[in-house]
Amino acid sequence: MTHTAALAPVLAEHIAAVNAFDEDAIAATFADDALVNDAHREFWGTEAIRRWAARELVGDRVTVAVTEVLDHYGDTIVRGCYDGDYDKTNLPDELILTNYFTVRDGKIVSLFVIRNTPASY
């Protein structure tokens, strides 16, 4: 079942760390063997995730303004308005990305970042 939810503490810490451009704090929110999938690319483990965060979040000074939080059978779906110094060619003025988080034992074990488009039916 899907319903509106509050951010779990680790997810609030994660968003705050992204907005603070703090790669150490970002990496600390993930389990050692976590998976991030961003733009159809996989990053496994905290060291790979740290490199991804350093280059693509901190390096591009990405910020996230959360617009919606949903619980879906224990996973958390977070939609947010993204901004930063990244290449915005062919992107909408307001970039909304959907983050699909799985949290276990107080750590993020998976994060999938998706730019969804509305279904035509």
Residue ranges and their predicted role:
Residues D24, D32, V109:
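Glycine-centered loop/turn positions within well-structured domains
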Residues M1-T29, S120:
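Short, low-complexity N-terminal intrinsically disordered segments enriched in polar/charged residues
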Residues D33-W44:
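A short gly/proline-enriched turn/hairpin at secondary-structure junctions
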Residues M1-H3, R50-Y121:
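A beta-strand edge to alpha-helix "cap/lid" segment located at domain peripheries
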Residues E42-W52:
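Short beta-edge strand/loop motif at the mouth of beta-sheet-based domains
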Residues E13-A16, A39, G59:
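Short, flexible active-site loop motifs that bind/organize anionic cofactors or intermediates
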